[in-house]
Amino acid sequence: MAGSFAQLARAAEQSRDTMLVPKTALETPPLEIHTLGAEVLRQSARRIGKVTEQTRELARDMLRSMYTAKGIGLAAPQVGIHQQLLVIDLDLENAATPPLVLINPEISAASASIDTYEEGCLSIPGVYLDVVRPTAIELSFRDEMGRPRKMKADGLMARCIQHEMDHLNGVLFVDRVTDEAGLQKELKDHGFQRQHVQSVS
């Protein structure tokens, strides 16, 4: 049965296998987050065959790097590792709230309703532009212990999951921007090049 993010979070809180790491910035994050123009961001990620302690430690290092960069989501390809692994935390202020770890995520359904919302990305710092996405999704994935899970998400959580899952296919949010003038201005203002955007229909 699909559960909400809150239900999954409560279940994680009640177990010993949470992925809690301090939600504070480190002087030197364990992983480098690659930025627009890096070829590693355009490569597809591979499914993870077996979830191991090495997988969990990668997720922890991703969280440490994400918190240091003050982000709410990070995909393994952003740190140069082409595995289907995402970490998300929409509650950065609450140290006790566990993050969400998604391994081999697959969207099984998306709402017909769509909305437009401003997105940013740790791989394109400073750039914020509107992107259209389905309002709600249903997905299946494995958690940090390798257990199969199902989940329904809407609002910011649905958008964040879709954004991070794009990274697994070498797609960045700027590829989905339809405001060409705004895109060119934002990229130029923050030192990025339009030629590194690969627009998708």
UniProtKB/Swiss-Prot annotation:
Fe cation binds at residues 121, 163, 167. Its cofactor is Fe(2+). Binds 1 Fe(2+) ion. The keyword Metal-binding applies. Its EC number is 3.5.1.88. One of its GO terms (biological process) is co-translational protein modification. Keywords: Hydrolase, Iron, Metal-binding, Protein biosynthesis. It is an enzyme of class 3 (hydrolase). One of its GO terms (molecular function) is metal ion binding. It catalyses: N-terminal N-formyl-L-methionyl-[peptide] + H2O = N-terminal L-methionyl-[peptide] + formate. Transmembrane segments: none annotated. The active site is at residue 164. Removes the formyl group from the N-terminal Met of newly synthesized proteins. Requires at least a dipeptide for an efficient rate of reaction. N-terminal L-methionine is a prerequisite for activity but the enzyme has broad specificity at other positions. NCBIfam families: pept_deformyl (TIGR00079), PRK00150.1-3 (NF001159). Belongs to the polypeptide deformylase family. This is Peptide deformylase. It comes from Parasynechococcus marenigrum (strain WH8102).
